[in-house]
Design a protein with these regions (language model features):
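Short hydrophobic beta-strand element within catalytic cores of glycosyltransferases
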Residues: 80-83, 93
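Short acidic alpha-helix that forms the nucleotide-activated donor recognition element
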Residues: 46-55, 76, 90, 94
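A short hydrophobic beta-strand element within the catalytic core of glycosyltransferases
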Residues: 58-59, 74
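A short, well-ordered alpha-helix in the C-terminal region of glycosyltransferases
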Residues: 116, 123-139, 145-151
Length: 155
């Protein structure tokens, strides 16, 4: 949350919609950021598609994610993604092409990537979203993944 708070303090106008769970240790911080207009907490949602549909970008930093469904879903809906340069996340995002990769555990790196997004013009954001969608079709379609898995396992 520190990167978002710093951007807000630096005068950038945005609201992060928080969808899903977070640890209890963040409760007070989220409530404070919500009162400042930095975030809006929605909790767990059975149907996340409406949130992707209204998002300009999806921010999903992680220390240990594996293959992130959030990144895949966001990209499939044509949204640029800001995520961490770790195994699993880096496979779904091409840095500065379909989104941005930040350094793990680096508030400054996440800040810089979020700032880069906010300073990117809308037409370029839309192009990045289209590239993200196409990457999902070309590399992560279920038939492709199953065929690649069968080949890898030599079944």
């Amino acid at each position: 949350f520190s990167a978002a708070e710093k951007l807000h303090d630096d005068g950038y106008k945005f609201v992060l919609d928080l969808v899903g769970f977070f640890e209890d240790e963040y409760k007070e911080r989220v409530e404070l950021l919500e009162s400042k207009g930095v975030v809006k907490f929605h909790g767990f949602q059975e149907e996340p598609r409406p949130y992707y549909a209204t998002a300009d970008c999806v921010v999903m930093p992680s220390y240990h994610e594996g293959m992130s469904n959030v990144n895949l879903e966001a990209s499939a809906t044509g949204r640029p993604v800001i995520t961490t340069d770790i195994p699993g996340c880096r496979e779904s995002v091409e840095n500065e092409y379909t989104g941005w990769l930040c350094e793990p555990k680096s508030v400054n790196s996440l800040y810089e990537k979020m700032k880069a997004f906010l300073e990117t013009d809308i037409s370029k954001r839309e192009v990045m979203g289209k590239y993200a969608r196409q990457k999902m079709v070309d590399e992560f379609d279920k038939k492709i993944v199953v065929n690649d898995t069968v080949k890898a396992l030599k079944l």
